[in-house]
């Protein structure tokens, strides 16, 4: 029994379609089984980053790593061909990066930098018709980027303690200075209190005792008339006065440096020594009592 030609054509087309669908499904399954694990997940600056490939078949021809969304020669980092003396061959995108490839398809990026961030893709060639691919996103952060927020309470506490301590020390210093000033002023006033009291008493005494101008010998030498003490001295006064010593000491003015020394009697004028009747009065006038004034007391 022969199969019609039209039926054979339809069967061939159906078989080809089924094979194509099976190949696509196998490719999708291979891509789904291959994935990249980042160690660590969030790398920081100057930290080593391992991109470990999971789901690699036991046998393969080679694998290529790319940095970027496109996979071509300009984005190729390196090609690794196992079984040869020098398996790793760097690509144009390697630059100054320090990358080491491993036979299982993984790669190690040493001392990662923020400029190394981007999309990393790996393509593993099983044969000329089958290539497995996987990709991952890598973001390299600045070193210790989150440390300030972590240590913020500690730094704030230290800052607050420093400020409070400085304020307390300043207040204590100001209090000590104020105490010393007050104590010094109080002691100075206590030492100065006796002086004003003594000066006050002296001023009271001096004000109570009126100063008597000192009599110099020249005044007595110039006097030639006899003193008249009696009723004839004042015609309108009938009282008789006598001289009595004052109980108050004589206080001479400070400006008068020629005051008479009470201990040294004045010389008696020659023309007054010949008159004995007025000798007593002349002696009283020539040698006055050291008193600020003479008290006159009326006698009967």
Curated annotation (Swiss-Prot):
Region (Disordered), start-end ranges: 259-291
Keywords on record: Glycoprotein, Membrane, Signal, Transmembrane, Transmembrane helix
Localization (cell): Membrane
Transmembrane segments: 158-178
Chief location of this protein within or outside the cell: membrane
Tissue distribution of the protein: Ubiquitous with highest expression in prostate, uterus, fetal brain, mammary gland, adrenal gland, skeletal muscle, small intestine, and kidney, and lower expression in lung, cerebellum, testis, liver, pancreas, bone marrow and ovary.
Ranges in the topological domain labelled Cytoplasmic: 179-300
Glycan-carrying positions: 104
A family per Pfam: V-set
Swiss-Prot/TrEMBL induction comment: Down-regulated by dexamethasone (in vitro).
Membrane topology: Single-pass type I membrane protein
Membrane side Extracellular: residue ranges: 33-157
GO cellular component annotations of the record: membrane
Signal peptide segment: 1-32
Family: Belongs to the immunoglobulin superfamily. CEA family.
Protein name as it appears in the record: Cell adhesion molecule CEACAM19
Taxonomic path: Eukaryota, Metazoa, Chordata, Craniata, Vertebrata
């Amino acid at each position: 029994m022969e199969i019609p030609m039209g039926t054979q054509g339809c069967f061939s087309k159906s078989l080809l379609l089924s094979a194509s669908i099976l190949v696509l499904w196998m490719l999708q399954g291979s891509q789904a089984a291959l994935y990249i694990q980042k160690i660590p997940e969030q790398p920081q600056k100057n930290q080593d980053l391992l991109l470990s490939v999971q789901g690699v078949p036991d046998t393969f021809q080679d694998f290529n790593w790319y940095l970027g969304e496109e996979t071509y020669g300009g984005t190729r980092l390196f090609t690794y061909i196992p079984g040869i003396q020098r398996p790793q061959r760097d690509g144009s995108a390697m630059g100054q990066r320090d990358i080491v490839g491993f036979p299982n398809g993984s790669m190690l990026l040493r001392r990662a930098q923020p400029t190394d961030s981007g999309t990393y893709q790996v393509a593993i060639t099983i044969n000329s018709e089958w290539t497995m691919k996987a990709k991952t996103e890598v973001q390299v952060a600045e070193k210790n980027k989150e440390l300030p927020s972590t240590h913020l309470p500690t730094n704030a506490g230290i800052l607050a303690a420093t400020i409070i301590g400085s304020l307390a020390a300043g207040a204590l210093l100001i209090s000590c200075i104020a105490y010393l000033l007050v104590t010094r002023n109080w002691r100075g006033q206590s030492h100065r209190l006796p002086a004003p009291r003594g000066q006050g008493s002296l001023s009271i005494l001096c004000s109570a005792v009126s100063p008597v101008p000192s009599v110099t010998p020249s005044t007595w030498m110039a006097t030639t008339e006899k003193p008249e003490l009696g009723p004839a001295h004042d015609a309108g006064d009938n009282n008789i006065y006598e001289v009595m010593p004052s109980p108050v000491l004589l206080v001479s003015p400070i400006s008068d440096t020629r005051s008479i020394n009470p201990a040294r009697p004045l010389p008696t004028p020659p023309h007054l020594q010949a008159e004995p009747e007025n000798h007593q009065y002349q002696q009283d006038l020539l040698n006055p009592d050291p008193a600020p004034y003479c008290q006159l007391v009326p006698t009967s």
